[in-house]
Structure formats: structure tokens, C-alpha cells
């Protein structure tokens, strides 16, 4: 799945940032043609060192790296989820004792709200906005976060229309293509079947003609269809916005917070 998602994300980056990079579609195609797909726990040896990938539990196909050389073991992670999510099982930490660990620390200095509490807050807010005949806009990352938010709402018994837009729809197709990576593929398939897909401007206008929940990239409000929804919904007090993604410094989402 990482192979498919990488191509999708890089192409989207080029589309948004246009001529700001020294590479384009031909270079991407060349990179993909020379790429090798490696499965989890598949040991690769180079010289006197070996490495293998383990599931990070963060996004589908997301990996940590276990490196061994000269009887020493190093464990390297990017984003990692030790508890798992509605979509994915937790990170694979069946790795034994390590000599060194290098890990991300995005929230290491923060006390995060318990997951059940944050999910309940989102569900309650969604119902509150719908009850006052408004639309709830949830800007969200295309990969995993959009799908997770939809799963939280639908699995809670939320019976109102949920719309999904943008690149998240293509990511849905990738996730459905690799059910063996998902925690419960049948539940996820049911969620996607209940979500209303919006693919063009006319469908967006029709979608906003009645109270609903809209899930759309970009998660930090940097471009994407999120800009359209924000402009359409921000001047009506009945509507609401829920920021469920990390907001980087200098982004519109961070300023809104």
C-alpha cells in the first residue's frame, strides 16, 4: 500500500506546488519503476548489516525499521501508534531488546486527551451542529485520518449524511485494495459504502444544500477543497468546524486554533 499511496501523494504535491520542484511526472514514473516492494518482517541484507520493516500502526503500510549489524540492534521509527486505531492494529513491537531506539516525539511533552473522550466530543459536536440545522466541516488528512473520522461517526450510530471529498476518495480505494492490513476490513467497507462521495463542484454545492458532515482535505487548511468549504460555511453561525489533525506552525489551521 505504501507504493500506491506514495505515487498518489507525490502526484498531488506536484499538482499543488506546480513548478517549485526540479522533478515532475517523468521522474516520479522513473522512481516507481526502480522501486522494490518489501513486506513486513522480510529481512534484507546489505554487507554486514540487515534490516526489516515492522508495522508502525500509524497509516496503512507505515513502517518502523529494525537494523542489525555486528551483534547490535537499532530500532528506528517515524510516526508510531502503540494503541492502534479503528482502521489499523497497533504497532508491531515484538522485536526483543534493543541497543538503540530512535523515535519521533511529536506529543512527548503533551498530555493528550483519552481517545474515547475525544471521540465522544466529536460525536456530540456533530449532533449539536446537525440539530441546529447546520453543517459540520472536518478538514482532515487524506490518508487514514479522513477514514478514521468517518469510522468514528458511523460506528457510533450517527445517522446523518456524511460527505467525503478530495484525495481521500482515492485513498479509500487503496485501503480497500489491501484488506489484510486493516483491523476489520468488513467494518471499513461498510463505512465507505455509507459515506457519500463528492467529486466535482456541482456535487459540492448540492451537498451543502442540507445539514450534513463534510470530511475533506487538506487537514491543515492549506489548499485542497477545504478552502471552498471554509469559504462557504464560515459565515453562518449554525455551521461548525472541527480540527482533528495536527496543525503545523504557520498553517491556516494553526492560525484558526
Set out the residue ranges of the language-model regions.
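Acidic, His/Gly-rich catalytic cores of divalent-metal-dependent hydrolytic chemistry
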Residues: 257
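Hard-cation-handling environments
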Residues: 123-252
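His/Asp/Glu-rich metal-coordinating catalytic cores
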Residues: 1-155, 159-162, 179
Amino acid at each position: 500500500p505504501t507504493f500506491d499511496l506514495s505515487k498518489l501523494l507525490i502526484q498531488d504535491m506536484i499538482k499543488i506546488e506546480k513548478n517549485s520542484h526540479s522533478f515532475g511526472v517523468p521522474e516520479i514514473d522513473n522512481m516507481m519503476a526502480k522501486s522494490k516492494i518489501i513486506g513486513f518482517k522480510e529481512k534484507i541484507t546489505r554487507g554486514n548489516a540487515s534490516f526489516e520493516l515492522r508495522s508502525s500502526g500509524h497509516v496503512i503500510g507505515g513502517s518502523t525499521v529494525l537494523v542489525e549489524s555486528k551483534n547490535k540492534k537499532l530500532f528506528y521509527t517515524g510516526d508510531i501508534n502503540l494503541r492502534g486505531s479503528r482502521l489499523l492494529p497497533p504497532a508491531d513491537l515484538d522485536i526483543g531488546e534493543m541497543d538503540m531506539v530512535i523515535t519521533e516525539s511529536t506529543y512527548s511533552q503533551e498530555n493528550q486527551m483519552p481517545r474515547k473522550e475525544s471521540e465522544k466530543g466529536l460525536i456530540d459536536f456533530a449532533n449539536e451542529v446537525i440539530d441546529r440545522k447546520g453543517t459540520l466541516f472536518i478538514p482532515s488528512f487524506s490518508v487514514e485520518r479522513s477514514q478514521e473520522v468517518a469510522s468514528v461517526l458511523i460506528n457510533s450510530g450517527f445517522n446523518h449524511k456524511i460527505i467525503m471529498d478530495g484525495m481521500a476518495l482515492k485513498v479509500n480505494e487503496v485501503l480497500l485494495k489491501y484488506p489484510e492490513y486493516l483491523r476489520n476490513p468488513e467494518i471499513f467497507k461498510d463505512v465507505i459504502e455509507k459515506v457519500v462521495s463528492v467529486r466535482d463542484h456541482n456535487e459540492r454545492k448540492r451537498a451543502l444544500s442540507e445539514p450534513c458532515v463534510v470530511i475533506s482535505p487538506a487537514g491543515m487548511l492549506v489548499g485542497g477543497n477545504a478552502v471552498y468549504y471554509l469559504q462557504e460555511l464560515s459565515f453562518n453561525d449554525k455551521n461548525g468546524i472541527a480540527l482533528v489533525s495536527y496543525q503545523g506552525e504557520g498553517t491556516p489551521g494553526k492560525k484558526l486554533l
